[in-house]
Amino acid sequence: MDSRLQEIRERQKLRRQLLAQQLGAESADSIGALLNSKDEQREIAETRETCRASYDTSAPNAKRKYQDEGETDEDKMEEYKDELEMQQEEENLPYEEEIYKDSSTFLKGTQSLNPHNDYCQHFVDTGHRPQNFIRDVGLADRFEEYPKLRELIRLKDELIAKSNTPPMYLQADIEAFDIRELTPKFDVILLEPPLEEYYRETGITANEKCWTWDDIMKLEIDEIAAPRSFIFLWCGSGEGLDLGRVCLRKWGYRRCEDICWIKTNKNNPGKTKTLDPKAVFQRTKEHCLMGIKGTVKRSTDGDFIHANVDIDLIITEEPEIGNIEKPVEIFHIIEHFCLGRRRLHLFGRDSTIRPGWLTVGPTLTNSNYNAETYASYFSAPNSYLTGCTEEIERLRPKSPPPKSKSDRGGGAPRGGGRGGTSAGRGRERNRSNFRGERGGFRGGRGGAHRGGFPPR
């Protein structure tokens, strides 16, 4: 850790020296004096020249004033000369750079009655990240102001708890284990690989094997995925955003969503992470790519997915250094969204074992997985689905129904006059209800006469 910090300091010192050479500064410490703009330097020079000119002309004018008024007291003249000398000495003092100790000078809207919140500057002053001030981020209070959604979440949690299979887990080295032995094919697969990126950010040594994206791509996920299924892949916040998409395409998935985990530091403001050598800024978020396989439409496949129940953001406190566990909320998002009961968690740990999931990972301390027993939970027709109640179906968000031709109005072929089937432009002027030159019957919106009302 100390060697890493020393290396960062040496690199910073070298950058400052190179910058000083480019700017023509005498040393790295004098860079600040050269960063003033040309306009500022010109303004400072003009101000100094104006002050010197005023000092040079003020002494003769003062002497003439005393002579005109008959005041020739030498003491007063000496006092005035001393005052001028003091002012000139202050002017000749070297320029001192002003040091700002708080953000009051830079706050936005300070002249208004309602100053703006500058969360970026507040982070610089206090170390509190801007995401610390997002309200109602917890599962318990997120839907307090939305009673229908709160009731929907409660009903879905009860249904999921009733339909969950007993928790099963298998201790296995995923790199050497043939995952094709896992049966049956799964509706949901969650991958949480121990990436090298996680340990670069923490600056500690990994206590397990770090997986590269080449190793992850070799996994035969497509062999254990159902024809209609979803995958959730934690990919960090760096190169994994692109390489994770490559993995999804190789396994036959299409990326359809990006769930973002935003980390707060309310409990430990100002804590700085070890800077990733491959990053410019300190990253405070991670991404979980979501992929879809097969044809699933939210408007027609309500038996398999319930869309728009949760949001695609997870906002929780950042874990301690060295802890690479992901928030448990990802399980709630998956269970609320997909109604499939065959759920697989790869690279799981003892802390992630939960009902309704088959957990596989090298760090598990025990195993209870039995292929025949697990397959028996889904032997009945449609038993791989959790099902849905009438109340859940009524409360859940739905896509608007498609509009038919009759809903749009009309249904009869175009033609005739503007209002209906009478196509003449003045041929039947003697008929009742005739509309003159435009033709047709006056109607509403539908039917043969553009409104469906029979002619009177």
Curated annotation (Swiss-Prot):
InterPro entries: METTL14-like (IPR045123), MT-A70-like (IPR007757), SAM-dependent_MTases_sf (IPR029063). It is found in: Nucleus. The record marks 146, 242, 245, 298, 399 as: Interaction with METTL3. GO terms for molecular function: mRNA binding; mRNA m(6)A methyltransferase activity. One of its GO terms (cellular component) is RNA N6-methyladenosine methyltransferase complex. GO terms for biological process: forebrain radial glial cell differentiation; gliogenesis; mRNA destabilization; mRNA modification; mRNA processing; mRNA splicing, via spliceosome; RNA methylation; spermatogenesis. Residues 425-440 have a biased composition (Basic and acidic residues). Residues 45-76, 393-456 are annotated as: Disordered. Residues 245-254, 297-298 are annotated as: Positively charged region required for RNA-binding. Residues 409-423, 441-450 have a biased composition (Gly residues). Residues 135-136, 237-238, 255-258, 278-287, 308-312 are annotated as: Interaction with METTL3. Pfam families: MT-A70 (PF05063). Heterodimer; heterodimerizes with METTL3 to form an antiparallel heterodimer that constitutes an active methyltransferase. Component of the WMM complex, a N6-methyltransferase complex composed of a catalytic subcomplex, named MAC, and of an associated subcomplex, named MACOM. The MAC subcomplex is composed of METTL3 and METTL14. The MACOM subcomplex is composed of WTAP, ZC3H13, CBLL1/HAKAI, VIRMA, and, in some cases of RBM15 (RBM15 or RBM15B). Belongs to the MT-A70-like family. This is N(6)-adenosine-methyltransferase non-catalytic subunit METTL14. It comes from Bos taurus (Bovine).
